[in-house]
Design a protein with these regions (language model features):
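SF2 helicase motor core recognition
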Residues: 147-159, 276, 343, 363-366
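Cys/His-rich short segments
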Residues: 252, 261-346
Length: 366
C-alpha cells in the first residue's frame, strides 16, 4: 500500500501496545473451552445448504470461496457449521463484518451455538477491551473473533479460516490515514497463511464476480430462502414530479400511513445521518466546509452543530454568511434527523425510533 511500515503496524496494534508499558497484566491461563450447543443445532438444513456445506467442508487450503446466497437463504448457518469444523480441529476462526451495528446479532448467533467466549473487536470499544481481545486471541484464549476491518490482522493462534460477510460492502475500505481494503487484506492474508477464505453476499461485488468468471474464485449458490417464501415485492416509485415533505415523497407518505393503519411496522432506510448534508448561503452560494479536509459540513439539528463526517471535526453554526454577511443561510438535502422530524410531525401518536451512528454510538443504546 506504499505506506511507512510503522504506520501499517500501528494500524493493527492496540493503542496500549504502541508504547512501552510495564503495567499491562495478562492472565495466560484465561482460556475458554468451546462446547457445541446441540439444542441450537437442531435446525434442519435445506438441500442447497447440505450440498454446499459438504463441498465447503472439503476446502482445506487457500481457495477463495464465494457463498452467494439470497437474503434469508441461511448463510449464517453455513458460517456456524464451518466455524464448528475448525473449532473441532483446535483452530481459530475470524469473521469479518463491514459495520459495527452488524456485530450484536451475529455475536448472539455464535453465542447460542458455542458455549464459550466469542471475541468482538471494533473501534468503539475501549482501549482495554481491544487489548484484552487482541492478547487472548494471540495466546489462544479465544478462538472465535467477530470484528470490523480493524480486526483483519488479529494475531489469532492457529488461524484456520477467515469469513468475510457482506463482502461487497464499501465499508471494508478505510479512506483516512492508512488506506486499505479489509476485504482484500483478508484474502491476501489467507493466501500467505494458506488457509480457506469464505466470502458471503447476496449482492457480490463486480470484482468478485469477475474472479469467479475467471475461475480464480469458486462459487456456491444458495438461491432459495430457508422458509420457502418468495422474496419481497419491489415497487419502484417515480417521484420526479412529486412534492417532497422533508425529503419524503407524498406517495411514500401515503404508503407509510396505509401500512401503519393496518397495524404493521415501517422501516425507512436513508444513508445520510444528521439533518442536512449542506449548509449554504442562498445569496452568494457559500457552502460550509471543513477547514481540515475541505469536506462539506453536515448540519446536525439535535446538537446545533456542523460536523465533518470525514474527520469528525465539529464547528459552531454560522448565523450569517462569512463571505457576504447575508442572513439567508439555509440547509439543503435530507438526513435521518430531518426524516425523523417530518414523521413525528405527521404521525404524532406513532412511536418512532431513529437508528444511526449518532443515536446508537453509546454502549447499550442498540
Amino acid at each position: 500500500y506504499h505506506h511507512p511500515i510503522g504506520e501499517v503496524f500501528f494500524s493493527f496494534i492496540p493503542t496500549l501496545l504502541r508504547k512501552k508499558n510495564d503495567k499491562i497484566i495478562f492472565d495466560l491461563d484465561d482460556n475458554t473451552e468451546y462446547k457445541l450447543n446441540e439444542e441450537d443445532k437442531k435446525l434442519k438444513l435445506t438441500k442447497e445448504q447440505n450440498i454446499n456445506l459438504s463441498k465447503l467442508n472439503k476446502v482445506e487450503k487457500f481457495s477463495p470461496s464465494l457463498i452467494y446466497g439470497v437474503t434469508g437463504s441461511g448463510k449464517t448457518e453455513i458460517y456456524l457449521q464451518l466455524a464448528e469444523k475448525f473449532i473441532l480441529q483446535n483452530k481459530s476462526i475470524l469473521i469479518l463484518v463491514p459495520e459495527i451495528n452488524l456485530i450484536p446479532q451475529l455475536e448472539k448467533r455464535f453465542k447460542d451455538r458455542f458455549n464459550g467466549d466469542i471475541g468482538v473487536y471494533h473501534s468503539r470499544q475501549t482501549p482495554n477491551q481491544r487489548l484484552k481481545v487482541w492478547l487472548r486471541s494471540k495466546f489462544g484464549g479465544i478462538r472465535i473473533v467477530i470484528g470490523t476491518r480493524s480486526s483483519v490482522m488479529m494475531p489469532l493462534k492457529n488461524l484456520g479460516a477467515i469469513i468475510i460477510d457482506e463482502e461487497h460492502d464499501q465499508s471494508y475500505k478505510q479512506a483516512e490515514g492508512f488506506k486499505f481494503s479489509g476485504r482484500d487484506l483478508a484474502i491476501k492474508r489467507s493466501q500467505i497463511e494458506n488457509i480457506p477464505v469464505f466470502l458471503g453476499s447476496a449482492t457480490p461485488s463486480l470484482q468478485t464476480l469477475k474472479l469467479v468468471k475467471e475461475k480464480k474464485f469458486k462459487k456456491f449458490d444458495l438461491l432459495r430462502r430457508v422458509d420457502g417464501k418468495k422474496p419481497p415485492k419491489l415497487i419502484p416509485l417515480d417521484i420526479s414530479d412529486s412534492p417532497l415533505l422533508g425529503g419524503i415523497a407524498i406517495q411514500t407518505m401515503s404508503i407509510i400511513e396505509a401500512t401503519i393503519n393496518k397495524g404493521e411496522q415501517v422501516l425507512i432506510f436513508l444513508n445520510r445521518r444528521g439533518f442536512a448534508p449542506l449548509y449554504e448561503c442562498d445569496n452568494c452560494g457559500w457552502v460550509a466546509k471543513c477547514s481540515s479536509c475541505e469536506s462539506n459540513l453536515v448540519f446536525h439539528k439535535s446538537k446545533n452543530r456542523l460536523i465533518c463526517h470525514k474527520c469528525e471535526s465539529v464547528y459552531g453554526v454560522n448565523k450569517t454568511c462569512p463571505d457576504c454577511h447575508s442572513n439567508e443561510i439555509n440547509t439543503l438535502g435530507t438526513g435521518t434527523e430531518r426524516v425523523e422530524e417530518v414523521l413525528r410531525s405527521s404521525f404524532k401518536k406513532v412511536p418512532i425510533i431513529r437508528m444511526d451512528y449518532d443515536s446508537t454510538r453509546l454502549k447499550g443504546s442498540i
